[in-house]
Amino acid sequence: MSNESNDLEKNISHLDPTGVDNAYIPPEQPETKHSRFNIDRGTLRNHFIAAVGEFCGTFMFLWCAYVICNVANHDVALTTEPEGSHPGQLIMIALGFGFSVMFSIWCFWWGFEPSRFSLFVFGQSHLTSQMCSDVVSSDHCWDGCWWCR
């Protein structure tokens, strides 16, 4: 009988005199929507930087493509207005969009690589060294490149 009473005492030892279970700790309730999703200043700052980068890249792509389309549509060689699009215009517009994407990707991948760009933003690197590091960087080369031999 004493063995059973010891087990009973162990089972109710975590109860306070009112019978409330002190071992149960309720989970923290989120106070705001931001704490529920674990969004702090650093996370918001990173999302803002990513959004600005996406905006700049998209704007550069669309602006370059817009300029190419205007140049193609105002060709002085076409003296009369054709009823449809001229094949030369279509090829120029297609190549313009392709080169616009290529230029935007090249600018934002190599020029704004996070390690180099953060050094520039925080004043540890100058603009000229930022540009030179793009040229000299081995990231641009491949194994068969004559420069890297």
From Swiss-Prot:
Aquaporins contain two tandem repeats each containing three membrane-spanning domains and a pore-forming loop with the signature motif Asn-Pro-Ala (NPA). It is a multi-pass membrane protein. This is Aquaporin-like protein 2. Coiled coil: none annotated. The keyword Repeat applies. It is found in: Endoplasmic reticulum membrane; Cell membrane. Residues 1-47, 111-149 are cytoplasmic. Keywords: Cell membrane, Endoplasmic reticulum, Membrane, Repeat, Transmembrane, Transmembrane helix, Transport. Residues 1-35 are annotated as: Disordered. Belongs to the MIP/aquaporin (TC 1.A.8) family. Residues 69-89 are extracellular. Induction: During exponential phase in rich medium and repressed in minimum medium, hyper-osmolar medium or in sporulating conditions. InterPro entries: Aquaporin-like. It comes from Saccharomyces cerevisiae (strain Lalvin EC1118 / Prise de mousse). The gene is AQY2-2. The keyword Repeat applies.
